[in-house]
Amino acid sequence: MKKFIITISREFGCNAREVARKAAAELGVEFYDKDLVDMAAERAGISRDSFLDSEEMLDKNADRLLKSFGYGSSTQFYSDKAVKAQVDIIRDLANKRVSAIFFGRCADYVLREYPNHMNVFLYAPLEARIKHMCETYDLSWPEADKLIKRVDRQRHNYYKYVTGKNRGDRDNKHLMIDVDRKSVV
């Protein structure tokens, strides 16, 4: 079979990671998820926590960072260093001679020009995501709602910082799936 790459991005709380893992298992391909963070942090020469903290700071300072030019702060330096390391890791892994699924980490944008690839976006209605989070993590409805909105905002800001695009837009997506449909999971 010819090598292929699938990137999967998603809304928080829609059980997309489980869908992505099942797809990778069914297809018998590599699955890259949170291990991308570890590899990128190592390559950037920063701790995993610093890498994740730099992403969180992107959310807190997104407007300032998007408008700034150059390295205005150590946070931005770490963010830029972390992003570059992550992009390099994703490209290095995609250049291997094996098929793979990349989950999140802006891989849809990073690999947009690679041959034989498909970008998938998984989503679900807010109510379904809240219900899933309540059942899976024993959260109250208001806690789950607040968490989903915060994480979605963070991911949107991070995606915008890295790509200049809006996460979830149809541009650069080949397939969008509502995972609330019971046959998907």
Where in the sequence are the language-model features?
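Conserved small/polar residues in nucleotide/adenosyl-binding loops
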Residues: 184-185
